[in-house]
């Protein structure tokens, strides 16, 4: 009999709670653990389940989940989705290495460019990236607000080493989330992970900081003459650095990064609450 797959969401904050909640209730033949250092959040999910509030539709979902503190981990996992802030990645990866099966996959769903450091610690063939084009806020213990429409959420995944490895399995796992949310386009595979990373990084660099400082939505920044000029300058600098590194930028949800400010509608309902 085939052993049941074991999946961990390490860093089950806002986005980790959303992803882990859907993965726990999408029909996968897998054991899914949501792991966080936030004791109150973990205990609330243990007692009442993970609550997901969908801002776009007004729906509320309650998902029964396995919730753990890091010190309560005992299993080795086939796939670990890393969803913490990457400032502690060296320590976190060193810790998680002990909980990853020999053929396991560490999938960074973080912002920035985390894969190189992770690969140095756990091995390049075990490292994958997932670029998330959706957002969430933690609004209470055990409760996350999904700020994106479930039908428009996407995750673009790729292998750091360029070899397929467990990419097919990771895609199948995330495709199950697409099925339960009615979003067949939820997960796509890219052969240009670096390009996808740099595209997301450019958006965050150009819009997130300005959004925090001004209180404007991404769409308002793109429409305003002065804010648009600032964002465009930052984007150009990101494009130039990526080009020098030999990176070809990927589209995000079909939007060409080079034409981003000419079509701001995609960002109209987005708002950055934190510097990412």
Explain the meaning of each model-derived region.
Residues 249-276:
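C-terminal active-site/capping subdomain that shapes the small-molecule cofactor and substrate pocket
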Residues 40-44, 115-117, 165-166:
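Short, charged/polar "capping" segments at the starts of alpha-helices
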Residues 59-145:
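Rossmann-like NAD(P)(H) cofactor-binding subdomain of soluble oxidoreductases
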Residues 50-67, 204:
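N-terminal glycine-rich dinucleotide-binding loop that anchors FAD/FMN and/or NAD(P) in oxidoreductases
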Residues 5, 78, 153:
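Nucleotide donor/acceptor-binding cores
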């Amino acid at each position: 009999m085939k052993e049941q797959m074991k999946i961990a969401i390490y860093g089950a904050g806002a986005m980790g709670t959303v992803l882990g909640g859907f993965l726990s209730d999408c029909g996968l033949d897998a054991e899914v653990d949501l792991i966080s250092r936030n004791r109150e959040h973990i205990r609330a999910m243990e007692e009442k389940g993970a609550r997901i509030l969908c801002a776009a539709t007004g729906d509320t979902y309650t998902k029964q989940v396995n919730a753990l503190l890091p010190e309560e981990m005992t299993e080795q996992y086939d796939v670990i989705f890393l969803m913490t802030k990457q400032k502690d990645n060296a320590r976190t990866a060193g810790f998680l290495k002990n909980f990853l099966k020999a053929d396991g996959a560490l999938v960074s769903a973080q912002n920035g460019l985390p894969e190189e450091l992770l690969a140095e610690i756990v091995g390049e063939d075990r490292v994958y990236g997932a670029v998330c084009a959706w957002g969430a806020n933690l609004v209470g213990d055990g409760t996350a607000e999904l700020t994106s429409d479930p039908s428009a959420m996407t995750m673009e995944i790729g292998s750091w080493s360029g070899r397929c490895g467990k990419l097919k399995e990771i895609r199948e796992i995330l495709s199950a989330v697409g099925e339960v949310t009615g979003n067949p386009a939820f997960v796509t595979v890219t052969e240009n992970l670096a390009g996808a990373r740099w595209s997301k990084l450019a958006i965050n660099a150009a819009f997130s900081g300005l959004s925090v400082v001004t209180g404007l939505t991404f769409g308002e920044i793109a429409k305003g003459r002065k804010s648009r000029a600032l964002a465009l300058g930052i984007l150009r600098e990101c494009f130039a650095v990526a080009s020098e590194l030999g990176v070809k930028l990927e589209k995000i949800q079909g939007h060409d990064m080079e034409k981003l400010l000419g079509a701001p509608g995609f960002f109209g309902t987005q708002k950055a609450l934190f510097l990412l």
